Each structure stands twice: as C-alpha cells, then as structure tokens.
C-alpha cells in the first residue's frame, strides 16, 4: 500500500503510474483569481472538489463545483480554476502533461 498526501500551496503531482498522474491543487496565487486560461494539447484533465469551494472556468462557461463530482475538461479546451483558501481539489491527467504540450494565455 502506498499512501500520498499534500498540504502545501498550489499544485503538486503526488503520484504517477504508467500513463497518468494524480495531483492535489490547493489555494495559491495562481488559483486565487481568474486572470489566465490554459489548454492541454495531449490530455483531458479531470477535477474533483474534496474541500472548500471552487469555480471551474471553461471557455465561455463557469461551473461552481460540487464536492465529490468529477468535472472533466476535454483536451484542447481553454480552462482555469479558482479556489477558496480552504479548498482541496484532486486533479487527474496524463503523466506527460507539461509546459511543452500546454498553452497558456494571460488577461491584462
């Protein structure tokens, strides 16, 4: 049995296996405001709110996340997540997701 945890800020990949990884996302500057969007060119990305509150933005829509529901952002869609200070979000994506296959746009 392997057990992983993360109680830091921002995002951390806590476990990887073959072609996928699980990360934990917590409050940090990057996730405190809706000031950018990103899209992954090689993977879908799934989010599960475990604690706190979060808003998931996808192109021209926003979703107030509900705990323990899976929100899957399809490959290539622009998105961003904003979380409360007490939030914890589980993130699942391909293990090779990186800056090389992700595009990011910032708003002025």
Where are these regions (language model features)?
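Double-stranded beta-helix
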Residues: 2, 84-108
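A short glycine-rich, His/Asp/Glu-containing loop-to-beta-strand
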Residues: 3-37
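Histidine-centered active-site/metal-ligand motif
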Residues: 38-40, 79
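Short, conserved beta-strand element in jelly-roll/cupin
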Residues: 41-56
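A cytosolic small-molecule/anion-sensing beta-strand core signal
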Residues: 50-51, 67, 85
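Short beta-strand His + acidic residue motifs that chelate non-heme Fe in jelly-roll/DSBH
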Residues: 56-57, 73, 79-84, 89-91
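Short acidic-glycine-tyrosine-enriched beta hairpin
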Residues: 59-76
């Amino acid at each position: 049995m392997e057990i992983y945890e993360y109680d830091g800020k921002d995002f951390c990949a806590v476990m990887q296996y073959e072609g996928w990884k699980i990360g934990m996302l917590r409050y940090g500057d990057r996730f405190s405001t809706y000031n950018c969007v990103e899209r992954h060119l090689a993977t879908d990305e799934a989010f599960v709110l475990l604690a706190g509150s979060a808003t998931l933005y996808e192109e021209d829509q926003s979703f107030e996340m509900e705990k323990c529901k899976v929100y899957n952002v399809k490959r290539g869609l622009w998105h961003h997540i904003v979380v409360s200070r007490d939030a914890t979000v589980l993130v699942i994506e391909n293990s090779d997701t990186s800056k090389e296959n992700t595009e990011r746009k910032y708003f002025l």
